[in-house]
C-alpha cells in the first residue's frame, strides 16, 4: 500500500483497455490490398479448408482476414474492405472481408441473410 506522498510523487496509472481488432485503429472498416489468398485448416475438432487472405491495410498494418460465404473472386492485388470480427477456429484471424464492397463480389444464388454477403435482391 503506497503512502499519500508516494501517490503524489507518482500517481496511479489507469489500465488501458485492449481492443479485439487493433489494426482498425478505432475505425469501423479499413481498405486494404490482398497480398496473398490461401486456405488454412481450423484447429481441433473441426476440419475444413477455410478461405483467408493476407491483407495490407491503408494504415500500413498487414493482417489475415477471413473470406465469408461460398466461393469468391479474390486474388492478389484485389482491393478489399475489412471489418473486425474473429473466426473462432482459426487462430490469428481477427478480421472479416466485407462481401459486395470494392473488388469483392457478393455470394451467388443466396436467398437468406443476403445483406451479410453483399447479394442483390433476386428478380421475382
Curated annotation (Swiss-Prot):
Alphabetic keyword roster: Methylation, Ribonucleoprotein, Ribosomal protein, RNA-binding, rRNA-binding, tRNA-binding
Annotated stretches, region: Disordered: 1-25
PROSITE patterns: RIBOSOMAL_S12
Chain's role: With S4 and S5 plays an important role in translational accuracy.
CC terms in the record's Gene Ontology section: small ribosomal subunit
PANTHER family: 30S RIBOSOMAL PROTEIN S12 FAMILY MEMBER (PTHR11652)
Coiled coil segments of this chain: none
Name of the molecule in the record: Small ribosomal subunit protein uS12
